[in-house]
Regions:
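A polyanion-binding, active-site-adjacent surface
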Residues: 16-181, 187-228
Length: 228
């Protein structure tokens, strides 16, 4: 049994959306990423080395969208934002703001359970240098569209970084500049409320561009919106 939380749709349309929401374990769409997966698998055969599936509550009102799996994070563990510094900040913040319960222990079989939220990535496979190419974003975007459509109660989306913001907007058939970039920007995007955040990467936290308090305020804003 997979260690991440399974998603069980309740209707035929949701079932179809769900089937389109998660790429195949051996997804062939992006040749460069396929080669990178193969190289990682050869060097580290005990790692997950595949498209990291979405993780969280199938009835979530909040979807959190990151950039892509980190090589030694989700690419290693098989769960988004698990096993690296970005995940520590993200899941600590979700626990603090009531969007998670249990204990985050940087492995997919810990006791962490997401509540009313789901975590996914704009690009599902780890890219070299953590930088997906434009064509890789395009190839993966239908999964993001379907992921949103498969969440029947979705109302809010937090984008972690500009790649996530841009891909969410395009997945909604909006222009990439339909919502301004920048931390703390909130705006309607199609049927959803979009909350922009700087990515919770080690680089952003080490340089002070993003502080734990700034990050927490994003999720408190989401909480206020959902409770209004």
């Amino acid at each position: 049994m997979c260690p991440w939380q399974s998603v069980k749709p309740k209707t035929n349309s949701r079932t179809m959306d769900l089937k389109r929401a998660e790429p195949a374990r051996t997804c062939p769409l992006c040749p460069r990423l396929v080669d990178y997966r193969a190289a990682n698998a050869a060097a580290n055969p005990d790692w997950f080395n595949g498209p990291a599936p979405s993780f969280g509550d199938p009835n979530a009102r909040l979807l959190i969208v990151g950039l892509a799996p980190g090589r030694t994070g989700a690419n290693r563990t098989g769960r988004p934002f698990t096993g690296d510094a970005a995940g520590r900040l993200l899941y600590d913040t979700l626990l603090k703001t009531g969007f998670a319960t249990g204990t985050y222990e940087e492995r997919p079989d810990d006791s962490l359970v997401l509540t009313d939220c789901m975590v996914t990535n704009a690009v599902r496979c780890a890219p070299p240098g953590n930088k997906p190419l434009p064509e890789e974003e395009i190839a993966c975007r239908p999964f993001l569209t379907a992921r949103m459509q498969a969440l029947p109660k979705l109302r809010a989306i937090v984008t972690l970084g500009d790649v996530a913001r841009r891909n969410v907007l395009k997945a909604l058939n909006l222009k990439a500049n339909a919502v301004d970039a920048g931390h703390g920007v909130m705006a309607h995007a199609g049927p959803y409320r979009l909350f922009n955040s700087y990515h919770c990467s080690r680089l952003n936290t080490n340089t002070g561009r993003l502080t734990p308090q700034m990050f927490e305020e994003i999720f408190l804003s989401v909480q206020r919106y959902l409770e209004a």
